[in-house]
Amino acid sequence: MCEGPSRISGPIPPDPTLCPDNYRRPTSAQGRLEGNALKLDLLTSDRALDTTAPRGPCIGPGAGEILERGQRGVGDVLLQLEGISLGPGASLKRKDPKDHEKENLRRIREIQKRFREQERSREQGQPRPLKALWRSPKYDKVESRVKAQLQEPGPASGTESAHFLRAHSRCGPGLPPPHVSSPQPTPPGPEAKEPGLGVDFIRHNARAAKRAPRRHSCSLQVLAQVLEQQRQAQEHYNATQKGHVPHYLLERRDLWRREAEARKQSQPDPAMPPGHTRMPENQRLETLTKLLQSQSQLLRELVLLPAGADSLRAQSHRAELDRKLVQVEEAIKIFSRPKVFVKMDD
């Protein structure tokens, strides 16, 4: 449904066939846009068409570009991002982003390689200094023996005989080797050989071994001494330790016994009445001893009373002694028990 002329302004004109009465097209545009076959009579009459000869369309210099934009659309032109086109046409070639990190690493490696090559060429051109070996400071004042030997003057002539260490010298069990006649060296001649090449050392050592004194091995004596020491140690063990309880075990047994007694005494007696406490054993025995002494003293006084005294004073004294004896006997019976309970004071 059309509500008047279109208000869209752009390179793409609206369709004039929707509302032909609202559009005024020039004659040149009618044949190009609407077409001659439609033969729409917008604002011209048949007489003007008949009398006026048709003219060709007026095409400006930018008409081709406008037509191309109308066919392709303006969105393709507006959304061009760095040569990337959204239209059907051929797009420009996209450039790959440059990796600056790899480029920097490559340049650093090139610089390091060039620096190493310069160092190598510099080292090859200069002599290397020798590294001094470590030497203890206590040998600073000690002269080198090799240096002293090198500084000594050599022999005047090369005809002097050199002194060599023989095979049979400074060897053996520590005893001086027997003097055995050795072959005399022949005077040097024109065909003289080096010293020591004409001596049969194997035969010489065999003769020296036969003539050397034999020494008995001391292994049997050492074995006898070890066996004697073991026998004495076994006898001492049998006499002092075998069959006897060690001293530390005896002490441990006494300690356990004392701990058991203390634990037994500290436990409350089930036969003890409430409000009482058990009298210590030493106090009980001390009290019992005093009661026995009092009993013997009362019996002695009772025996010493006169038998024929019938006075009131004698009778009262006898009755008093009897009453005390009864009390002492009752107390002796009480304190003779293994456990005596005493009432605690409030």
Curated annotation (Swiss-Prot):
Compartments in which it is found: Cytoplasm, Cytoskeleton, Microtubule organizing center, Centrosome; Cytoplasm, Cytoskeleton, Microtubule organizing center, Centrosome, Centriole; Cytoplasm, Cytoskeleton, Cilium basal body; Cell projection, Cilium
Keyword Phosphoprotein: yes
Biased composition (Basic and acidic residues): 114-125
Ranges of biased composition (kind: Pro residues): 174-190
InterPro entries tied to this protein: Enkurin_dom, Enkurin_domain-protein
Principal location listed in the UniProt entry: cytoplasm
One of the record's GO molecular function terms: alpha-tubulin binding
Segments of this protein annotated with the region Required for binding to microtubules: 91-171
Swiss-Prot/TrEMBL keywords: Cell projection, Cilium biogenesis/degradation, Cytoplasm, Cytoskeleton, Microtubule, Phosphoprotein
Domain Enkurin: 251-343
Keyword Metal-binding among record annotations: no
GO cellular component: 9+0 non-motile cilium; centriole; centrosome; ciliary basal body; ciliary base; cilium; cytoplasmic microtubule; microtubule cytoskeleton
PROSITE patterns: ENKURIN
Subunit structure: Interacts with alpha-tubulin. Interacts (via central region) with CCP110 (via N-terminal region); competes with CEP97 for binding to CCP110.
The protein's role, per its UniProt record: Microtubule-binding protein which regulates microtubule organization and stability. Promotes the stability of astral microtubules and facilitates the proper orientation of the mitotic spindle. This allows the oriented division of basal keratinocytes and contributes to epidermal stratification. Required for the assembly of both primary and motile cilia. Destabilizes the interaction between CCP110 and CEP97 by competing with CEP97 for binding to CCP110 which promotes the removal of CCP110 and CEP97 from the mother centriole and allows the initiation of ciliogenesis.
Protein name per Swiss-Prot or TrEMBL: Enkurin domain-containing protein 1
Species the sequence originates in: Homo sapiens (Human)
